[in-house]
């Protein structure tokens, strides 16, 4: 039998529904693993162990009586600490909000609870989802379970580290410039940035209003699809939310991909930002594997990463400055150095800069839409390198921008990152799949074809 800490959320939910697994048994195993490993990983800012165990007992009583709340009944979940959980701190990993306690759940948290999931606690993040990894804050940064000397990616760092290490099977992350997909890439898990507007952001502390997304982080494609089914839906309380027909993303995952058209954006990692040779080789292997699975793979071109990056920088930092300006004027010393520097940069962009960036953004959206008119899915790099050491500021800064994730925050298209292999140094390599707006089902289908062929869902760090 699979060890409980490596059990998928889908399998755990099925076992609980069939009365083959007790929610208390699962919670006990995970809390023991958290107690043993988290002092090295720092995935949690606030572990709510007593409340989680009480919720597991209630879930067990309900399951015994055949009363299941939903498809995640009794399954533990971790929440990134920029998302409100009633009665728990929402600190955003910052001194600014260290005493802030939420009075209600974020909509994404409420949806998970309604589906039966049990909140374990709040997870480490880069400060305000932009600064980090930082050592000048009240809480230490999360570390990579594949090698704790290395960065787990960010800003959803605790989410990535905890899922990869088997502390929980699923977590919530947010993605404004790649913050779900970066930890997914560094930690070898599955993370999706859904289509802009598909998942409500109400109750989530904003970084940049027009770029923010909420997304699921899991060890398998099936779990990610199931979690997104729960999270998706229109919320009138989020001005960016879009009303679309609800999809059952977990259905059809095992369909073959014969005839599916995949556009390979080679120039991202070969020309625009030359990748580590191991990353390049891994991406070529993914492309060949999809061809063997029946997909039609061909090269496709988009505007350069430099163009996408320039637009993202102006919009993200301008919008972040608009949010943080009052605190930065009154309490600059309460910010960590990295967050302060990155947000302050937004003060130097003019209204004209912002308008021009938004104008160019429309052209970039049209370019990606046109590419996806020729193919069904795009394949490209996520990170250009394996995870860097966490204690080397120069490496952290260098790898911060060596990625191909921000284009799809700019355009809003759904983008999924997952493991593409393991480096000679024992760290995950990654791939990114991008789809048409609200075509997450196709994205999951392609990701599952790769996962099934490569067995990435069975590769875990050796941390014990």
How would you name each of these model-derived features?
Residues 23-28, 57, 248, 277-300, ...:
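Acyltransferase
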Residues 36, 110, 114, 164-268, ...:
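Structural helix-boundary/capping segments
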Residues 72-92, 251-266, 315-365, 369, ...:
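Short helix-loop capping/hinge segments that flank enzyme active sites or metal/cofactor-binding pockets
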Residues 12-18, 97-101, 212-219, 344-349, ...:
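Short, well-ordered beta-strand elements within core beta-sheets of diverse protein domains
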Residues 30, 52, 74, 80, ...:
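Conserved hydrophobic/aromatic pocket- or pore-lining residues that grip, position, or stack substrates
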Residues 1-54, 292-294, 353, 459-464:
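An N-terminal boundary/leader segment
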Residues 11-17, 31, 61, 258, ...:
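Serine-dependent amide/ester hydrolase catalytic core
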Residues 72-214, 321, 380-396, 461-462:
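Short glycine/serine-rich loop/turn segments
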């Amino acid at each position: 039998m699979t060890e409980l800490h490596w059990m998928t959320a889908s399998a755990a939910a099925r076992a609980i529904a069939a009365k083959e697994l007790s929610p208390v048994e699962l919670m006990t195993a995970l809390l023991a693993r958290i107690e043993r490993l988290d002092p090295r990983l720092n995935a949690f800012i606030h572990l709510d162990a007593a409340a989680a165990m009480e919720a597991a007992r209630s879930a067990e009583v309900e399951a015994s009586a055949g009363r299941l709340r939903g498809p995640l009944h009794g399954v533990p979940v971790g929440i990134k600490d920029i998302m409100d959980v009633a009665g728990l701190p929402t600190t955003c990993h910052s001194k600014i909000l260290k005493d802030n306690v939420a009075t209600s759940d974020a909509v994404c948290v409420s949806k998970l609870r309604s589906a039966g999931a049990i909140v374990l606690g709040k997870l480490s993040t880069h400060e305000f989802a932009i600064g980090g990894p930082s050592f000048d804050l009240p809480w230490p940064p999360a570390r990579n379970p594949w090698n704790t000397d290395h960065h787990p990616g960010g800003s959803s760092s605790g989410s990535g580290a905890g899922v990869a290490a088997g502390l929980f099977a699923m977590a919530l992350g947010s993605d404004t410039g790649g913050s779900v997909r970066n930890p997914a890439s560094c930690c070898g898990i599955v993370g999706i940035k859904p289509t802009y507007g598909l998942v409500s952001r109400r109750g989530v502390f904003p970084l940049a209003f027009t770029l923010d997304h909420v997304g699921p982080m899991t060890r398998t494609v099936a779990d990610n699809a199931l979690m997104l089914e729960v999270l998706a839906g229109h919320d009138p309380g989020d001005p960016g939310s879009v009303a679309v027909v609800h999809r059952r993303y977990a259905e059809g995952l095992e369909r073959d991909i014969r005839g599916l058209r995949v556009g390979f954006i080679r120039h991202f990692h070969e020309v625009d930002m030359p990748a580590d040779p191991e990353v390049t080789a891994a991406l070529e292997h993914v492309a060949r594997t999809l061809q063997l699975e029946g997909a039609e793979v061909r090269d496709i071109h988009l505007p350069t990463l430099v163009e996408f990056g320039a637009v993202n920088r102006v919009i993200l930092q301008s919008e972040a400055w608009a949010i943080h300006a009052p605190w930065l004027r009154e309490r600059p010393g309460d910010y960590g150095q990295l967050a302060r520097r990155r947000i302050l940069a937004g003060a130097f962009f003019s209204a004209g800069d912002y308008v021009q960036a938004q104008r160019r953004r429309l052209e970039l959206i049209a370019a990606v839409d046109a590419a996806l008119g020729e193919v069904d899915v795009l394949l490209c790099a996520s990170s250009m390198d394996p995870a860097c050491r966490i204690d080397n500021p120069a490496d952290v800064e260098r790898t911060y921008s060596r990625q191909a994730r921000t284009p799809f925050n700019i355009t809003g298209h759904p983008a999924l990152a997952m493991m593409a292999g393991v480096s000679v140094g024992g760290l995950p390599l990654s791939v990114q799949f991008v789809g048409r707006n609200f075509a997450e089902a196709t994205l999951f289908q392609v990701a599952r074809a790769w996962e099934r062929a490569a067995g990435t869902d069975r590769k875990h760090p050796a941390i014990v």
